[in-house]
């Protein structure tokens, strides 16, 4: 029996305002609030909200027989909370159905997995906290920014406790193999890989309304027939796409919503099920290893990282940004931490691409700038001001060795505090047990005359105040 695995990406960056050279050192607010409000509100009204309503209607109609997964960046969630709070509520309704899974990713939709492993781990943890805070779900499957993946990343993902990762079924890593199987990482054998079926995904997200396409118009029954006609042993079809496919990239008038609504009915006729990524991982075995020595992604024709790191402008900007990572992680300034995340969004480097032809048109379509050079200049002006603010707290006179020593001290203190908190909790539990044991339950006299609670027996194990003092000292270090 075949299964379809749907995954939708939602991401919006905090776009930068026009930031001049003369603003450096004087203006510490970098964002175009009007553009951010207008863009996410428009997309939510055209796409996110009606698509959520569509999915909720489908789940009510088909129950557990229809399931999907989402990956929503932290920066998108923040903007949706500010500008379109009704989206968060509608997503909570979807989460409550039990038919929607939330995937993990980097909070800032960043390139940290390629540049800064410590930052990568920190962002993934922050993202998952945000998902649990809003939707009450703990992600167990990981998807990196723009499906960026290689063997080194798989090792980090497995170490964070994830059971699987989804990425692009790039032709140059597949060779003769099919994306319609579950694979595993050669360096993280417990981590299962789910590969995007690029053709079938792009048939919906990019070609659906293209009247010049040989298969136009695409109907639900035709599409399900394509999946059903795949070789019998190919049991899985991963359909990964941007959520804007519904209503934004493919307008409502194209029939995209009606197409989606009809899929479960025709799938059921062919015996095709819908699985979430975690269900795929639990129900399907890996058929073998899939080595990925160099990073891949789902962007551009090359399916590599050249969309963000393909020219000297991009490389210089990324290098400058991550050169201050350790210093930023030492900062306690909330605004600096926030700006650090917002400036890491991969979109800023995507706008700097100098590619031509079809790839170039995609980059220019999404960019708010006239040229890649304008994008670079504006970003570097902002980054220069940001670096000044960081250096005011941790000057360049403090070398990396001293910084590493500070980081080590902070980590040791954090571990010590965690250990002390565990000890305090154990002592508290022991005190509760001792107190409970002091009350005899079989004496009638206890019922006739109320008595004051006896104090807990003092024993060497119950020196709680001393533990508190130790905790305070550890905190002040």
Provide a role label for each language-model segment.
Residues 1-49, 181-182, 186-191, 195, ...:
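Active-site and substrate-binding clefts of carbohydrate-active enzymes
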Residues 3-8, 14-17, 21-116, 140-143, ...:
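Short, well-structured secondary-structure segments
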Residues 433-477:
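Intrinsically disordered, polybasic Lys/Arg-rich low-complexity tracts
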Residues 53-54, 82-95, 174-188, 221-227:
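Alpha-helical scaffolding within the catalytic cores
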Residues 52-56, 88-92, 121-131, 154, ...:
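Generic structural signal for well-ordered alpha-helices
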Residues 13-15, 76-80, 110-112, 148-152, ...:
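Flexible loop/turn segments at secondary-structure boundaries
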Residues 125-179, 245-263:
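Catalytic domains of cell-wall/extracellular-matrix polysaccharide-remodeling enzymes
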Residues 72-146, 189-209, 234, 238, ...:
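Metal-dependent polysaccharide deacetylase catalytic core of the NodB/CE4 family, i.e.
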């Amino acid at each position: 029996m075949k299964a379809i695995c749907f995954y939708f990406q939602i991401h919006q960056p905090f776009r930068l305002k026009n930031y001049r050279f003369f603003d450096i050192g004087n203006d510490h607010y970098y964002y175009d609030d009007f553009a951010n409000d207008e863009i996410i509100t428009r997309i939510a009204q055209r796409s996110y909200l009606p698509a959520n309503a569509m999915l909720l209607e489908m789940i009510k109609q088909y129950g557990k027989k229809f399931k999907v997964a989402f990956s929503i960046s932290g920066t998108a969630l923040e903007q949706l909370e500010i500008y379109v709070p009704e989206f968060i509520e509608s997503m909570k309704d979807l989460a409550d159905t039990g038919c929607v899974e939330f995937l993990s990713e980097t909070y800032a939709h960043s390139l940290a997995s390629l540049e800064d492993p410590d930052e990568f781990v920190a962002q993934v943890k922050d993202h998952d906290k945000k998902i649990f805070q809003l939707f009450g779900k703990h992600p167990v499957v990981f998807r990196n920014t723009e499906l960026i993946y290689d063997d080194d990343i798989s090792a980090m993902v497995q170490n964070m406790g994830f059971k699987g990762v989804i990425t692009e079924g790039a032709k140059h890593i597949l060779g003769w193999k099919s994306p319609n199987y579950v694979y595993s990482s050669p360096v993280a054998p417990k981590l299962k890989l789910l590969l995007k079926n690029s053709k079938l995904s792009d048939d919906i997200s990019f070609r659906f309304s293209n009247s010049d396409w040989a298969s136009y118009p695409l109907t639900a029954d035709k599409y399900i027939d394509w999946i059903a006609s795949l070789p019998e042993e190919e049991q899985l079809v991963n359909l990964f796409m941007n959520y804007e496919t519904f209503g934004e990239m493919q307008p409502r008038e194209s029939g995209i919503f009606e197409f989606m609504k009809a899929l479960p009915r025709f799938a059921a006729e062919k015996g095709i099920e819908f699985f979430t990524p975690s269900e795929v991982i639990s129900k399907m075995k890996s058929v073998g290893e899939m080595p990925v020595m160099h990073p891949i992604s789902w962007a551009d024709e090359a399916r590599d990282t050249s969309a963000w790191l393909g020219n000297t402008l991009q490389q210089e900007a990324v290098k400058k940004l991550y050169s201050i990572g350790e210093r930023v992680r030492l900062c306690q300034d909330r605004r600096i931490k926030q700006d650090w995340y917002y400036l890491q969004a991969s979109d800023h480097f995507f706008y700097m691409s100098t590619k031509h032809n079809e790839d170039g048109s995609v980059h220019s379509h999404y960019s708010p700038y006239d040229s890649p050079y304008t994008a670079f200049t504006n970003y570097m002006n902002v980054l220069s001001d940001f670096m000044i603010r960081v250096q005011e707290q941790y000057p360049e006179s403090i070398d990396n060795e001293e910084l590493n020593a500070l980081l080590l001290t902070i980590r040791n203190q954090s571990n010590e505090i965690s250990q002390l908190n565990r000890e305090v909790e154990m002592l508290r539990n022991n005190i509760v047990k001792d107190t409970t044991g002091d009350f005899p339950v079989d004496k009638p006299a206890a019922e006739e005359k109320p008595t004051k609670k006896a104090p807990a027996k003092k024993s060497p194990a119950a020196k709680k105040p001393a533990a508190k003092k130790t905790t305070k000292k550890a905190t002040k270090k």
